[in-house]
């Protein structure tokens, strides 16, 4: 959680484009359409979507507000299931021994091991609950600026994909070069000169 934390780690974005119709309706519809499912798919390894900042485990944008001053405020929630490798190894060893006893053989084939591993993975995937990670978002639509409160690569990639899908607006992550392109008041020639610079090696 970024907004209520004592320390912040954030990524800055420039949002390219504007809505052609009512802004509030477009944002609300995009959030609702791509909110994280209330009921998780027990076989799905990763699930991601929007949820209200004040209610991250109840993604109801009809009930909870997404307006915070001049900003739209909401959260990206990523639910992920992670099965420890040693847990799979343990259950595989038990299942292999059981298979040997049932077949009367002292070995099993590579294909049989693959089938056993897939079966065990499916069973564990069903049983193990997802672990949620929540990343807050602050979006100033008028200024075309947005803060995502994380710098994790995977979270940023999920955010960029879901944001574009939700609003049909392109989020451009701000680095020195993209700041020159999107935020500076330099002329076209000046921008070209800056973008052609190479890093200095010490």
Name each model-derived stretch.
Residues 25-62, 66-136:
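Surface-exposed, low-hydrophobicity interaction/linker segments
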Residues 86-94, 178-192:
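Internal, charge-rich low-complexity segments
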Residues 5, 67, 138-141:
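Short, flexible turn/loop "capping" segments at secondary-structure junctions
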Residues 11-13, 72-75, 144-150:
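Short cationic amphipathic helices and targeting signals
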Residues 102-183:
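Internal, hydrophobic cores of structured domains that mediate oligomerization or house catalytic pockets
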Residues 188-202:
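Aromatic/basic-lined ligand-recognition segments
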Residues 1-24:
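N-terminal alpha-helical "arm" segments
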Residues 20-21, 81-83, 154-156:
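Primarily extracytoplasmic ectodomains and periplasmic/lumenal surface modules that are beta-strand-rich
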């Amino acid at each position: 959680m970024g907004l209520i934390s004592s320390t912040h780690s954030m990524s800055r974005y420039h949002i390219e484009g504007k809505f052609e119709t009512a802004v509030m309706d477009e944002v609300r519809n995009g959030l609702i359409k791509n909110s994280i499912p209330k009921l998780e798919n027990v076989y799905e390894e990763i699930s991601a979507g929007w949820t209200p900042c004040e209610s991250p485990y109840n993604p109801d944008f009809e009930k909870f507000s997404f307006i915070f001053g001049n900003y739209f405020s909401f959260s990206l929630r990523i639910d992920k299931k992670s099965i420890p490798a040693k847990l799979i190894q343990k259950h595989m060893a038990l299942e292999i021994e059981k298979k040997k006893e049932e077949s009367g053989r002292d070995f099993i084939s590579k294909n049989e091991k693959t089938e056993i591993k897939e079966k065990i993975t499916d069973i564990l995937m069903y049983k193990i609950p997802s672990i949620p990670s929540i990343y807050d978002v602050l979006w100033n639509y008028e200024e075309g600026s947005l803060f995502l409160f994380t710098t994790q690569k995977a979270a940023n990639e999920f955010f960029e994909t879901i944001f574009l899908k939700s609003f049909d607006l392109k989020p451009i992550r701000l680095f020195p070069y993209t700041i020159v392109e999107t935020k500076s008041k330099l002329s076209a020639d000046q921008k070209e000169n800056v973008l052609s610079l190479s890093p200095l090696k010490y």
